[in-house]
């Protein structure tokens, strides 16, 4: 029995090492994740963990393209610099860990991988670059759910028409260096184009009971855009 436990421990260690082999992070990042998870474990079980972790990450410098730092796609864990998407992704990964009583850095990495990539496959073309694609995939996994519905306040419909990445490949370092990836990105854009999402027009938002009952603390909010080829301009947490 002792030998079996020892083998099991070694196997688990090897699995953890393998999981982190494709990750890109510093010791500061892993220490911060562990500290945040420890803080989360001390909160009441019915706490709003999205809001708790969102507040804990407020103030981190906003830096764009923090995922574009390697010649080969790797799972980037960077809690020293965030953009709007990585902010939401890290908050969600921390929340899922705490809700499911997962307490290790490897657990966090696993959730972040599943959140960021379709089917958890760490590959540039599997990364959920367009946020409407991100919404659909994370809804499928049960990590989030959409609150859009017909009628007020979701009175308008967005028909997605994406193509910005393939038309502006030179703006994306990993596409510019690997033009062979364009075909797969174009296919993702084709599948996403035509999908419809209901939304709340900005001009209609007021401080009323309708909106207060619709948008709750901790909800993930996506701001759509009219910019050609894109679906959203910004995301955040209410």
Regions found by a protein language model. Give the residues of each.
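C-terminal soluble interaction/assembly domains
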Residues: 219-238
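Sec-dependent N-terminal signal peptides
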Residues: 7-16
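Short alpha-helix capping/helix-loop boundary micro-motifs
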Residues: 200-211, 224-225
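Sequence/structural signature of beta-propeller domains
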Residues: 46-58
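Boundary at the C-terminal end of the N-terminal hydrophobic targeting segment
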Residues: 19-23
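Positively charged n-region of N-terminal signal peptides that target proteins for export
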Residues: 1-7
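Acidic/His-rich structured neighborhood in mature extracellular/periplasmic domains
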Residues: 62-198, 216, 222-223
